[in-house]
Amino acid sequence: MMNFSNSYRQLGSDFYEESLPTPVLAPRLLLWNAPLAEQLMIPEELGQAALAQIFSGNQLLPGSEPIAMAYAGHQFGSFVPQLGDGRAHLLGEVFDKSGQRWDIQLKGSGPTQFSRGGDGRCAVGPALREFIMSEAMYALGVPTSRCLAVVTSGEDVYRRSILPGAIVTRIASSHLRVGTFEFFAARGEHEALKRLCDYTIDRHFPELQGATDQYIRFLDRVIGRQIQLITEWMRVGFIHGVMNTDNTSLAGETIDYGPCAMLGAYDPHTVYSSIDIKKRYAFGNQSAISQWNMTRLAECLLPLINADRNRAIDQLNPLLIAYTDRFNRVYIKMMGKKLGLTSLQAKDEKLIISLLDQLKIGKMDYTLTFDLLTKSLSSEPIASQMRGQLGNYFDLWQRRLKEQGTDLQEVQTLMRQQNPLLIPRNHHIEAAIAECEQTGRVNLAEKLLHVLRAPYEELTETHLYQDPPSDGDKNYQTFCGT
């Protein structure tokens, strides 16, 4: 079935608490990710009843030794010295058919020693959101954790109202977080911190092993992955919503989809999370927050760099100072590709910023605009439409494309690789959740998943999911749930 290993347990009991999932009354398989199951070599012959027992936590597989991981974190800028998995159980690690190692984690699987009075459960809505959103992000080409299954529990959970309960099975390259490092750094446990860093290097950056400056290079690599991740978020219009350090993956993957949402009309100040009152995690602020989170990681690494704290700071500071310029280079290159620019010139940054300014002023939809610009290269009616919306800018952009001398079909191919036809629109996600909460069915979710798994292709049903809601998400809010 699944051959579990448990390498994280070898770090020692300071890193986790042993914890078993709490059995549920009547597990039922709601969603199953067949392509991912095939990648993980899960036998096809297992029936839904058996899968529901396993991925509800009711039945443990041989070799699985569940734990709740310990970590701390900065939440909205304030440090909390102990958080940990309060409603999740790491079942262990498995290798897929290509030899890649994955964590297998249940969320909503019952209370742990880190629950802080919570029930350890998850409502079906947030579980469904994470499944749909993570699959959409994967198809869009964004580094992300993924969901293998959603199992309903047959039990109610009590939130703002009484809701059906569910357990979601998440896989990730690891669940190592900035907050994991903060947990030990805050306690001054430098030996444990070194073990953790060595383990993370072994798991994610093995090429650094043995280097005399491996911990400096480690920070550099993590920063690089974060820059790549945030750039991908900006490319597709993803707003994470809760970029706390305990939600910052050292593997450079999107994790913890709780209050996430997708950008509609372009505005860098857009926030949908109900708890982000000060707009700390607004769409346009995500790179700055990532830099802030990397600074927190750097602080944890200081005792591993040099016994003299000031010297350690001097060694790491250049990486943090360079973050903004480094991000901007990657971001501008990505935005250039969205506009079909095969090689950037100094003047192109102004071209990019001018378009974003125009989108903001005109309250134009981010995804639709780039989709239509892509289509305009082979459709005169769409070109005329975009010229009407963008005015002189459209002609300026077309002149720049002609100037670079690249065949327009090649340009359009480049643009389509960057610009999806559709994204997981907030109102479609909410409709799928509402259907499931009210009827227990996932018809809308399955139809939505079908098109979201091909975001760069024009399927028969694609047009049904492209348009933003009539109110432009004006009053839309998201809430933490999983």
From Swiss-Prot:
Keyword Zinc: no
Residues involved in Mg(2+) binding: 247, 256
Residues annotated as catalytic: 246 (proton acceptor)
Cofactors: Mg(2+); Mn(2+)
Keyword set includes Transport: no
Gene Ontology MF: a single term: magnesium ion binding
Binding site for ATP: 84, 86-87, 107, 119-120, 170, 177, 256
Enzyme Commission number(s): 2.7.7.-, 2.7.7.108
Top-level taxon of the source organism: Bacteria
Keyword annotations from UniProtKB, A to Z: ATP-binding, Magnesium, Manganese, Metal-binding, Nucleotide-binding, Nucleotidyltransferase, Transferase
Reactions this protein catalyses: L-seryl-[protein] + ATP = 3-O-(5'-adenylyl)-L-seryl-[protein] + diphosphate; L-threonyl-[protein] + ATP = 3-O-(5'-adenylyl)-L-threonyl-[protein] + diphosphate; L-tyrosyl-[protein] + ATP = O-(5'-adenylyl)-L-tyrosyl-[protein] + diphosphate; L-histidyl-[protein] + UTP = N(tele)-(5'-uridylyl)-L-histidyl-[protein] + diphosphate
Membrane-spanning ranges: none
Enzyme class, UniProt record, top EC level: transferase
Family: Belongs to the SELO family.
General function of this protein: Nucleotidyltransferase involved in the post-translational modification of proteins. It can catalyze the addition of adenosine monophosphate (AMP) or uridine monophosphate (UMP) to a protein, resulting in modifications known as AMPylation and UMPylation.
Protein's UniProt name: Protein nucleotidyltransferase YdiU
Organism, scientific name: Desulfotalea psychrophila (strain LSv54 / DSM 12343)
Gene name in the database record: ydiU
